[in-house]
Amino acid sequence: MDFKLTVLPGDGIGPEVMAEGLKVLNAVAKKYKHSFEYQYGLIGGCCIDKEGVALSPETLAMCKKSDAVLLAAVGDPRFDDPKLPVHPEDGLLALRRGLGLFANIRPVKVAPSLVNSAPIKAEIVKGTDFIFIRELTGGVYFAKPKKRWTTPSGIRKATDSMTYSEKEIERIVRVGFELARSRKKKLVSVDKANVLLSSRLWRQIVIEIAKDYPDITVEHILVDACAMKLILAPTYFDVIVTENMFGDILTDEASMLAGSMGMLPSASLAGIPAKGTKTFGLYEPIHGSAPTIAKQNIANPIATILSIAMMLRYSCGLETEAAEIEAAVDKVLAAGYATIDIFKEGNTKLGTAEMGSQIAKIIGG
């Protein structure tokens, strides 16, 4: 099969981990006789340097003509000053909005060989395997009104409003129900309905949609309670659905269960994934650009590699190939190979390129 992909290496360690992801994808293409055409674009700090914006209209147009988009990392400390007119992260927000990517899917699975790598007791994290579904294009991050001002008396103020429409909530919640149906048929909806009106609407709509999924067990949990339970009993969860800001915070917390943010992939989809269908999406590791370790061959490429597996599953309809990448990662970890972020005594330490080569080697036989 033939596919056209837009590749956005981005900033910091982005180009390094992307190179390893494509190395593994090329191994899959060779084995299964697929063709992947890569077209490259700029995003983030490197795009600001060259074009003065974090995402150009040309790059966005290129993404829209692709079967899927691969992104590595966005962020550059040179642009951290909040007074600057443009920031690297603006490009990512514009990309999500421009491509209609409303559903962020983040699997959190702890490999048996990494149960001792997390800062949490092994007996707690062992067996953790759940999926976070985060609404991505609404809520406070896309606030309207959103402003900052100084009052006549000289007091500085700022406001960000959290707004959700019924349609925005319904489509992301249906993603949650569909994925729950393909797993253990258990869905946890996270909100703050004891305080926020937007959360009360969220909960009401979840209750209404649940009638269409009588085979799914639904639980409502407040965001603060969820934050505690993720650390105390992560194996309790299977599929979690929540709004934008809550999901942003909780998924970073959950990443520590796997021992490193370098282990966790993500997919941002423009539709509801269903078996036998292809859904346009953006695929990226959940980690940042990590500029302090860039160009040192020490970054962990596994999150990028697993993101490519998600792309094969959701946007290419290639479940067998996706599962093979995931199995290859498990085999490499079980054999004791590790990058510095997950290294422990007894492991064989590998650099970024070497880790990618090991995984590609297993796929290539």
Swiss-Prot record:
Known catalytic reactions: (2R,3S)-3-isopropylmalate + NAD(+) = 4-methyl-2-oxopentanoate + CO2 + NADH
Name this polypeptide is given: 3-isopropylmalate dehydrogenase
Cited SUPFAM superfamilies: Isocitrate/Isopropylmalate dehydrogenase-like (SSF53659)
Family classification: Belongs to the isocitrate and isopropylmalate dehydrogenases family. LeuB type 1 subfamily.
Residues of the site described as Important for catalysis: 141, 192
Alphabetical GO biological process terms: L-leucine biosynthetic process
Function: Catalyzes the oxidation of 3-carboxy-2-hydroxy-4-methylpentanoate (3-isopropylmalate) to 3-carboxy-4-methyl-2-oxopentanoate. The product decarboxylates to 4-methyl-2 oxopentanoate.
Gene it is expressed from: leuB
Record's subcellular location: Cytoplasm
InterPro entries per record: IsoCit/isopropylmalate_DH_CS (IPR019818), IsoPropMal-DH-like_dom (IPR024084), Isopropylmalate_DH (IPR004429)
